[in-house]
């Protein structure tokens, strides 16, 4: 576990954080530019020192200002991946990967190289690599130092869209297979949803919220980030069963199920999905003989009048699902808070 309880004055920015990060999974550090995201992970790495407080990793004290104890960066067992790859141009990929290697067997080396899909690059030099390939090598080099935690500072920000998509696939795999915590700095909603288990929401140096991604996403505090064009709901649900003939998977939603296209997940394993309000309609009676597979019972808990539509939040088995309808439909059907309804979900995005 990573424990952070620090204060740091950085010019006009007063950074303050008090969080505990589990010993596995991806924790996103999310916020506007200048909110203190990179400064927070630099405090963990030792590149900057706090004014007050302490940071502990797996019962090791990295820094404690009260006792004036501070481990040098190179002794903290931390892997750091920057926005730019920072590879050594005069070393091959293999040479870059082996630089700083500690307590890593050949089998472990081969595993990391295979995990990141860079086996075919080992004899090449950085100058011949694409941006995405360079970042994969940089990640591999960080992992091969045998770190207790991996820090990633917007590793996709300098890449074009095709390279971002390419690297994202490897990051998704990496996040599921390595058994150390990852602190991942980003201001991308897509990266947040696809990669992170938890999110630290930062604003002007202060931690405004810290919880699982789906809880933060669905909370009012995150509303400004999603914009006003459309509501959305993020759910993390366990696999109930698979239906191979139709290539579909059912997720448990209380006593009901949510059908999605088939995913390679075991029964009981959680899958994160996003449902956009434009893909949801509401009926007063359960529809019969419809092509829509996802029809769920729920109760209206919130109604928001927008310029050109009405947004309704329906509580389904403890989960809030948003639907957007026309003002005409609202005037005709007169939906009200507390009313029992059925939601029809036309599409579900698997994150």
From Swiss-Prot:
<keyword id="KW-1278">Translocase</keyword>
<keyword id="KW-1003">Cell membrane</keyword>
<comment type="similarity">
    <text>Belongs to the ABC transporter superfamily. Molybdate importer (TC 3.A.1.8) family.</text>
</comment>
<dbReference type="InterPro" id="IPR005116">
    <property type="entry name" value="Transp-assoc_OB_typ1"/>
</dbReference>
<dbReference type="GO" id="GO:0016887">
    <property type="term" value="F:ATP hydrolysis activity"/>
</dbReference>
<keyword id="KW-0472">Membrane</keyword>
<dbReference type="InterPro" id="IPR004606">
    <property type="entry name" value="Mop_domain"/>
</dbReference>
<dbReference type="InterPro" id="IPR017871">
    <property type="entry name" value="ABC_transporter-like_CS"/>
</dbReference>
<dbReference type="InterPro" id="IPR050334">
    <property type="entry name" value="Molybdenum_import_ModC"/>
</dbReference>
<keyword id="KW-0067">ATP-binding</keyword>
<dbReference type="Pfam" id="PF00005">
    <property type="entry name" value="ABC_tran"/>
</dbReference>
<dbReference type="GO" id="GO:0015412">
    <property type="term" value="F:ABC-type molybdate transporter activity"/>
</dbReference>
<dbReference type="InterPro" id="IPR011868">
    <property type="entry name" value="ModC_ABC_ATP-bd"/>
</dbReference>
<dbReference type="Pfam" id="PF03459">
    <property type="entry name" value="TOBE"/>
</dbReference>
<dbReference type="GO" id="GO:0005524">
    <property type="term" value="F:ATP binding"/>
</dbReference>
<dbReference type="InterPro" id="IPR003593">
    <property type="entry name" value="AAA+_ATPase"/>
</dbReference>
<feature type="domain" description="Mop">
    <location>
        <begin position="289"/>
        <end position="351"/>
    </location>
</feature>
<keyword id="KW-0997">Cell inner membrane</keyword>
<feature type="binding site">
    <location>
        <begin position="31"/>
        <end position="38"/>
    </location>
    <ligand>
        <name>ATP</name>
    </ligand>
</feature>
<keyword id="KW-0547">Nucleotide-binding</keyword>
<dbReference type="GO" id="GO:0005886">
    <property type="term" value="C:plasma membrane"/>
</dbReference>
<comment type="subunit">
    <text>The complex is composed of two ATP-binding proteins (ModC), two transmembrane proteins (ModB) and a solute-binding protein (ModA).</text>
</comment>
<keyword id="KW-0813">Transport</keyword>
<protein>
    <recommendedName>
        <fullName>Molybdenum import ATP-binding protein ModC</fullName>
        <ecNumber>7.3.2.5</ecNumber>
    </recommendedName>
</protein>
<comment type="function">
    <text>Part of the ABC transporter complex ModABC involved in molybdenum import. Responsible for energy coupling to the transport system.</text>
</comment>
<dbReference type="InterPro" id="IPR027417">
    <property type="entry name" value="P-loop_NTPase"/>
</dbReference>
<dbReference type="InterPro" id="IPR003439">
    <property type="entry name" value="ABC_transporter-like_ATP-bd"/>
</dbReference>
<keyword id="KW-0500">Molybdenum</keyword>
<dbReference type="InterPro" id="IPR008995">
    <property type="entry name" value="Mo/tungstate-bd_C_term_dom"/>
</dbReference>
<feature type="domain" description="ABC transporter">
    <location>
        <begin position="1"/>
        <end position="229"/>
    </location>
</feature>
